[in-house]
Structures are given as structure tokens and as C-alpha cells.
Amino acid sequence: MNSRLQEIRERQKLRRQLLAQQLGAENADSIGAVLNSKDDQREIAETRETCRASYDTSAPNAKRKYPDEGEADEEEIEEYKDEVELQQDEENLPYEEEIYKDSSTFLKGTQSLNPHNDYCQHFVDTGHRPQNFIRDVGLADRFEEYPKLRELIRLKDELISKSNTPPMYLQADLEAFDIRELKSKFDVILLEPPLEEYYRETGITANEKCWTWDDIMKLEIEEIAAPRSFVFLWCGSGEGLDLGRVCLRKWGYRRCEDICWIKTNKNNPGKTKTLDPKAVFQRTKEHCLMGIKGTVRRSTDGDFIHANVDIDLIITEEPEIGNIEKPVEIFHIIEHFCLGRRRLHLFGRDSTIRPGWLTVGPTLTNSNFNAETYSSYFTAPNSHLTGCTEEIERLRPKSPPPKSKSDRGGGAPRGGGRGGTSAGRGERGRERNRTNFRGERGGFRGGRGGTHRGGFPTR
């Protein structure tokens, strides 16, 4: 409790220092000298009311009509002339811009001067993004309060490290390279193309060729995808959200999830130094679209996927300007979710070479890939799967068993009718209505406390 109170006090002290710097005060204790007092605020409010009243009477739609001849006396005509002269004098006055010395005008709520949890206003005042205050975002402390999940992650990491193939990498220009020469089908394909958007936002000249979405769409991903597989495509935060879906459809995948990378600025608070000319707001997140191919149900295909282990959010510190590398946590999410061992990373770099993955990219400085050696790791039956231990199976989140009508106290299943339950329309209807993996509840953990979305939407 004392440490928590101390942390709150330190944050309050930091905020006061930042406010003093922005308001031009000598120190945090002298902020009150530059802010409006209650009397000043009351005077400002009265002045506003007076201005509004005068504007209401002097507005163009509130102008009095010139009195008709014969219907008005001389006194009304004189009043009309005085009003016209007053309006002309006000129009000739120089415009004075009102200077706001504090944020009381923009406070959240109308009955209180306390901004409470108005993180958006706090960002305006201090430059700290709202996502800076989300707790337990790191891999080390995320499951600190959930011992079962922490143990599950530990066991899965051990199993993955034991079943990983040696890291392989291939330096190749993907624009000219025929990816069918890899001579393998992959369970997971991760694409990290160097989009023009990344360099357009930073204003830095690209040190590698930028790919357009037309170029990305020409990649023959469908030729190397296993019958049931997943693709993860980093698509930025602009036009790629729509064009990325087009790519997934072209490759034979259905979009089933959107993993968001939320960027914090705890170490360097302030406004974004660069802004995409096509953007209206400052963009502080990126998206990774996830596609599914084939039929995969989380309730029956536990040999291939383990759902609800991770969340669909990645929250890390924003990298330096010009650094377009993605957080390493995306690899953990993929490895925890899909039990397939044949993993391919396209547009990889030397820094992303990883056990259990085949990394292909134009910026790699070396190659050790051999198609026959790589295929030899998966010759035995089911050798393309990591497998699962009894302890992991016991700890991992599972889908609740489906409830039938008899379980709820009903009678025979619908469609039993003539010919018995097996011949009725109900059984065929249930078979027809069985959805694939995306139709069932979430692929990733929906997040505790309602912070995150709960999985794959239905079509």
C-alpha cells in the first residue's frame, strides 16, 4: 500500500512539473500564480454571458427590420439607426483571441472541476498516451496474478523449445524469388512487408525497397500453405486494413482476427514528431491481420491449436523513428496458439532469425537453408506438430461442452419427427450449422476486465 501511494505521489509530482513547464511557471508550487483564480473564472463566465447576449441581439438573423413607412413613429426609426451604428462599431473592433491558462474549460464532466480519469486530457496536458497507464503488459509480469496461466505458459515454452527445428534462413529477393522452391507446406506464415506507409509517417528515406499492396498480392502464398494453416500479415494502420483483407482472400484465407500493437511513449512523452499526411489523427497502433485456411475448430482440433492462451493485444514502447521492426511478442503469440512446427517468416531480418522458423528476406546477410534438410524434420507421421503433455492439456483453457435440449430439460432433439432422431432434419441441420474455427468463440483470450475483444467474429 505504501509503495502504491508513493508511486501515485511521484506521478502527481511529475504531472505538476510538466504543467509548470507548459504554463511558464517557475516551479510546480507556483502553478497557481499563473492560473485563473475563482474570481477570475467567475468574471470570465460573466463576460461570456454578456458577449452571448449581445451577439444574440446583434446577430444577422436577429436584426430588426427597417420600420415600414407610415407604421412607425420617429422614435422607432431612431432606435433602429442606433442599433445599426452599434453593430458597425463592433464589427470594426480588433479581434481578441481568448487565452486559456488551464484546462478547466475542457474538463470531463460538467459538474466537477476534477478531471478524474480523463486520459485524453492528460495526454493533451502532458504528452503521456492513455495506453501508458495499462498495467502488467510485459511478458514477465502479465500472468503474475494468475498462477495457472503462468504455469501453462512456462510448460508450453519448454515444449516449444524442445520441439523447435534449428533456425534456418535464406537471403532472397522475394520479388524475383519463386517461393515454391522452398518445397514445403507451412502451418504458419508470418509476413512483415516494408510498407511505404512506415517511411511516409517518419519522413525518413527508406534504406530498402518499399512494397506496394499490388506487389504483396502477387506473392503466391497459396502455393506453400498447408490445407489447414494460418497467415499473419502486418498491414500498418491505414489503407492496409482493407487491402490486407483482399490479399488474404486472394491467398485462400479468411480473416478471423486482428492483433493490435499499441505503442506507448513512457520513455519519451510528447506529441508525435511526424504525422502521416494522409492521416487526421496521430496513429499510435499497428495491425496484424490473421487469416485461417481450412476447417479448424477449437473444440475438436486441440492437436493443432490452443486457443485463449494469449490476448490479441501487444503493448510495448514505441521504437525509435525509422525503426520498422515489429515486437518479438508476435512470435510468442503464434507459437502458443498454433502447434504446427512448420513456420515461415517472410521479409525477415538478421534480428528475427529464430529457432523453429524458416526466415526468408532480402536484407539477410547469410543463408543456410537446404530444402531437403528442412523437409527431413517432418517425415514421420504427425511430426509437423509439437504435441502436448497431460499437464498442458489440463491447464489450458477449453471450450465449454455444447448443451443439448435434453441437458436443458427439453425433449427429443429438433427434427426427430418421422424416422427417428437420426433421420430427422435436426441432425442434418446441426451438421450444416457447425461452423469452422472462426464461427466459435474467441481464438485468443478476450482479456480480463473487459479490456479486450473476445475472439473471432462470425461471418
Swiss-Prot record:
Subcellular location field: Nucleus
GO biological process per UniProt: forebrain radial glial cell differentiation; gliogenesis; mRNA destabilization; mRNA modification; mRNA processing; mRNA splicing, via spliceosome; RNA methylation; spermatogenesis
Protein name according to UniProt: N(6)-adenosine-methyltransferase non-catalytic subunit METTL14
Region named Positively charged region required for RNA-binding: 245-254, 297-298
GO function terms (MF aspect): mRNA binding; mRNA m(6)A methyltransferase activity
Feature: compositional bias, Gly residues: 409-423, 444-453
Basic and acidic residues: bias regions: 425-443
Residues annotated as site: Interaction with METTL3: Y146, D242, R245, R298, S399
Origin superkingdom: Eukaryota
Membership in a protein family: Belongs to the MT-A70-like family.
Primary role: The METTL3-METTL14 heterodimer forms a N6-methyltransferase complex that methylates adenosine residues at the N(6) position of some mRNAs and regulates the circadian clock, differentiation of embryonic stem cells and cortical neurogenesis. In the heterodimer formed with METTL3, METTL14 constitutes the RNA-binding scaffold that recognizes the substrate rather than the catalytic core. N6-methyladenosine (m6A), which takes place at the 5'-[AG]GAC-3' consensus sites of some mRNAs, plays a role in mRNA stability and processing.
Residue ranges that the Swiss-Prot or TrEMBL entry lists as coiled coil: none
Primary site of residence: nucleus
UniProt cross-references to InterPro entries, sorted A to Z: METTL14-like, MT-A70-like, SAM-dependent_MTases_sf
Region feature Interaction with METTL3, mapped onto this chain: 135-136, 237-238, 255-258, 278-287, 308-312
A Pfam family it matches: MT-A70
PANTHER family (alphabetical): N6-ADENOSINE-METHYLTRANSFERASE NON-CATALYTIC SUBUNIT
UniProt region (Disordered), positions on chain: 50-73, 392-459
GO cellular component terms listed in the entry, alphabetical order: nucleus; RNA N6-methyladenosine methyltransferase complex
Keyword RNA-binding listed: yes
Range of residues in the leader sequence: none
UniProt keyword annotation of Nucleus present: yes
Keywords: Differentiation, Nucleus, RNA-binding, Spermatogenesis
Gene behind the chain: METTL14
